[in-house]
Amino acid sequence: MPYCERCFDEFEDEIEEYGYKPTPIFYGNGKRYFGVELEVDEGGKDNDNAAALKSIANVHEENIYIKSDGSLEDGFEIVSHPMTLEYHTEEMNWKEILREAVAMGYRSHQTSTCGLHIHVNRNAFGDNQAEQEDVISRILFFVEKHWNELFTFSRRSSYNMSRW
């Protein structure tokens, strides 16, 4: 739908571009921070839906933002700022966000297009670079050793896994 110049200038796109990466805001107190990227699909790449989900999550703080994702057919990615596990479970209103997303027609687990990505800050792995590198190498060893089980757990096809 075309907009007049004034409306176009006032229009706020609630869905950021794929490459959007704001300055992280860390929530909670602790050593480990987790950022969540939840892909949802089948409900539309819709500004009003994105705004509604953000209004649930961002009542007091900017906890989430929403991004485009080219791997999705008709949805977007809900991205949290880094938070401690306690903040995610006690302060973030994930249950209401997800309930509303489902009510809007979004799906995640029940699709072949969506994924859940958890980012962890490097300092969670140790107090210095040597400790961090040691833990990261053990994680890589675990992934290599248990690749077949992780592949099954991921629910990805061989084609999708090769793209990853």
Where are these regions (language model features)?
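Arginine residue identity/basic-tract feature
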Residues: 6, 32, 99, 107, ...
